[in-house]
Amino acid sequence: MKIVSFILILVSLLLFACNDDAKDENSRLDNQLNTKAAELASQFLIIDTHIDVPYRLEDNWEDISEKTEKGHFDYPRAKSGGLNAAFMSIYIPAKYEETGGGKDLADRLINLVEDIVAKNPDKFKIALSTEDVRKNFDNGIISFPLGMENGTPIEGQINNVKYFYDRGIRYITLAHSKSNHLSDSSYDEDKHWNGLSKFGEIVVREMNRLGIIVDVSHLSDSSFYDVLKVSAAPVIASHSSCRFFTEGWERNMNDEMIKKLAEYGGIIMINFGSSFIDNEFRLKREDWKKQLKEWEETHKLQDNDTRTQEYINQHSEKYMQKAVNVSQVVDHIDHVVNLVGIDYVGFGSDFDGVTDTPIGLEDVSKYPNIIYELLKRNYTDEEIEKICSGNLLRVWKEVEDVSNRIQLNED
């Protein structure tokens, strides 16, 4: 009996030792992956096609050349995360389609970005081309290409497309949360055009001619397919994710749309917002927004009433308990790769636009965490570089080439 007990104790000790060895080995491998992820983030050019810094700063100014208290983007965090090119979103709320003034707001936001660059020439530079992005990367400067979120500032004047090209805009999201004079919106139940308007088609062709990327994020499904019929160049979804994980939500792209996007040479840039990534989180968030609206209406509160913020602080947690993490964001990247291949996906975080960032992707310092997750899933260095920037640069260069061919044929 004593011998049996001794043997059992010995076996237990050996098992504990093996478990400890396995844990040590896993920890060692994990550390290696983290180290490599950080190295690749500093080595590769990383592009994010949608960061809402301008609108964030217009009413709540902070110096993003230094560490800021608020927001997701500033220079120190961008450098820490390896972000080299951040498309500054010139975001125009949907209400300006009705009220007017969208063009003026776009000008103010572009001016704001230009002022930041002028005051910090050693840190930031506006990028007008793929060549600019590569040159700035080589010089250690963060590129600010400009994308206009909402075509409302075109204001029915085709010459305004050229106007915004000259101001530095290199992609235009045709609509936002409401249908406008160019296109129907995915969020809007009142579809005006059943796709693109006739003027929207003219605008897409003019964007092709000038070398402005057409962005299909926020568009209705019908509008997306209309864009593919009209555009002579590949298009992007600058900040969308996969509807496969958020069933029935038109703001994300379904599998057939992603296949068509890839067939036409385009790319989907994955949005990091938790509502875009996880359906349970999205539905809870919708319930919370409904509850908040009902509470405001019951108490007859005006916009920006301080009592609303107090209510949010007191009650939001119980509605928003589910946490989304960086691994789930990479699930979306995986889904696109498995569906259409490695060449059609990238980063479109929506930082400073979304508030519900995942654990491990809290701000622009966290891109190495995505690379770490990709390494864990056996993505090669070459594949990771394509996701970080290569795919987007390919599409942008093709848009530039299409523009050159069109203008050459005009001469």
Which residues does each PLM region occupy?
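Positively charged n-region of N-terminal signal peptides that target proteins for export
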Residues: M1-V4
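Short hydrophobic/aromatic-enriched beta-strand-loop microsegments
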Residues: P234-S240
